[in-house]
Amino acid sequence: GYFTRTFCKKEFKKFGINDKWVQSNISLNKKKNTLRGLHFQTKPFEEDKLVRCIKGSILDYILDLRKYSKTYMKLIKVRLSDKNFLSVYVPRGCAHGYITLKSDTILSYSVTNYYSKKNERTYSFFDKKLKIKFPVKPKYISKKDLNPKIIL
């Protein structure tokens, strides 16, 4: 067995990270090579996210869309799995997405704002500016993610 702490208010406060979670979600991806994202919400529904893979494995992507940021339009990727127990914090103003590396992958994520369909946006993973090389070929992509609402 094992024990792992998934959240510690004291640690978040030490790094100045928002910890005002309003909702926690579980997402099941049945098939390997499922691509989701890059999702974000516009004001006043911007949100911070805390993402963890509790079963399976993903390559997680965060795209900084904050025009004032030194890392504007920079993309980072982190492998999350049920083996490494890592979590990733996605600040408001950043888009988030992932590709599954195993079937039956389950994610747990908490958010600091409520979902708003009107403020939901998707930035295309396939934007040439991002120059993404996926570790596996994306096979399963939702209509929403194939036809994103925004390309900068």
Q: What role is predicted for each listed range?
A:
Residues 1-86, 104-152:
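Non-catalytic, conserved peripheral segments adjacent to functional cores
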Residues 81-98:
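Conserved SET/PR-domain catalytic core that frames the SAM/AdoMet-binding pocket
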Residues 101:
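Basic phosphate/pyrophosphate-binding loop/patch that engages nucleotide-derived ligands
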